[in-house]
Amino acid sequence: MEFVADFETTSVRVYDPKTNKLDKLKSKAFVCAWAIIPVEINPDPEHIQKGRTIQSFLSYVNNLYREIGKHASGKHHPKLSIYTHNLKFDGDFILYEILKSGTAQLINEVRENVLYNFTIKFLDGSEVTFFDSMKIFPISAEKIGKMYGIKKLYGDWDYTKYRDESVEITSQEWGYVFHDVMIISKALADYRSRGYRENTQAAIAYNERLRRTYAKFNKLVAMRLKKNNYEGFRKAFPFDIMPLPFDLHKHLLMAYFGGISWLNPKYACVDLVDAHSYDVHSMYPDKMANFPLPVGQPVIIENPTLEEARRLIYNYDCVIVDVEDLSITLKDERHFPFLMFPTLGTKSIRMQGKIIDCKNEMAVLSNWDFKIMESEYNIHSMKITKVYLFRSKKGQYANFIHFFMEQKTAADKVRNDPNATPEEKQNAEVQRSIAKVMMNSSYGKDGTKLIRQCNSTIYNKDSDILEQQAKDEIAMPEYYLPSAIFICARARFQLFSAAILVRDDFIYSDTDSIKVTSEGNEILKNSPYFDVDPYRLGAWGYEGKYDTARFVRQKTYSYTQNDERHYTVCGAPESIKKSMKIDDFKPGMIITLEQIHEMGLEGRLLPVRVPGGVILEETGFQISTVDNWDEYNGRNMPIDFQLFRDIIKRKNANYK
């Protein structure tokens, strides 16, 4: 059975008098209220159970397992799954209690950079698995509630108020706690009613893609072979998407990287007037539906001549090459350093993560990235040692993408229909959200890493705080990596193809969008090679004009439209953005907590582990900068146009 739980917590904060920073060893946190409800399509407040301490919560969960077990049939052990909306936070209170007290064992934990789930086993053998509902719905409970039409119950919660068991929680405050569990309960029940059993967006979308593309393939049956018969597992897949052998998958992962986020140094921190923005309608779904993608296992060609390799690169859709002794430098400041393959820090110079210069490197490149390299870089030396030639199939996932594109389009019509009922509009919001998840989240599974740094949680008796122990885990391939490589490579090439149309008038790109000057906008509007349409899948859509704009770095810029200023700043909550002033908007800009509080706003909340669990500590914000940069030290160079141009000239001159 599945349930949804939520915790409200309180804390005792102790600050170091010398530094005024939180003393995490002397502070403490604990659960002061909890609520739990079954997953049900029409959540009933009468079904909610509540309590005040983490101990009472775990006791209730233990008893709940036993109660479910009474109704379990045959030899099957009961299954109890509990979802919380932000398990990284809530889970620490559970793990602290069981690891310190010994009331239960942590028998399984799936945690890489983030916590996905964990299973605990009580002393009587009861097992409970906790999942993070944010991995299914990565938005706030408030936004999910609006999507599902759940009205807010009476009540609110004052997070500045200290509450131990002696402090009564009012009915209005309990109403606030109940609200969140009811929202997630309904949303999760809705997903289950649609047949989505997986516990992350990516897994849901990937398995839906399999169901709609390879209806006769049952991956659950194949998974039974994985542990003891890996070759049998591989060959149970349809030929088109049979996972590559381990060594080949591990090697070709070096050809897989994401979208291009790049600020032209020429425009860094420059006050611009009349900039224009375009983005691609569903860039990645378009590549899945409308472009040739690889199928099956590759033909491997050893030690081809450069002429033979280039013939394959430019005449076939899906080719990967191994390149050795690679020394390249960007041609000049007008060209785009859109290569991101792994390099040694002592052999490469990078800006914004992109390669400006490298020497004697090894790379694994798709043919689309190879074309970018030949267009934008001076190649001083290069040897192609292997070519991996894949068969290709166009429209491999067209049925899957077009089905959900139609779902999204139909939902948009209802959302914009003035005659639609509130219930119809609510259903359309849910339908649209699911369609977007399906189209945009499935391909990433194919690029899953094999060697992953996993973290296990331990209790440190000396500090009375939870800690992480890192270890590498190796997994066998269970996805078809070449799909992810070429979906992303095709997407990068589309953005690159737009950028080279405008060259000097290119300002900024971020994965599926570009910003250009007014002169660049005129070039794009008149170019037969720039496909613009307000709706069509894969076409560029015009987002609008920025009256003024300032771009500081990747994912950090400000613009005005209709006399209203907007900030896009990665990692900054809305309260921080409201505190920003354009005169100070530059690398190294600091917004102190005092400045934020003067405006009546809340600072950025950072989790700090303390005895008992976690405290969310308010902090200010700083736009990062690059200090003490040296060539070939493995760090990015500053976004400085003069330095950028000088480095390129000097490095190219060294080879003449």
State what each model feature region is:
Residues 6-14, 22:
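Ser/Thr-glycine-rich phosphate-binding loops at phosphate-binding pockets of nucleotides
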Residues 2, 23-84, 92-656:
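Conserved acidic
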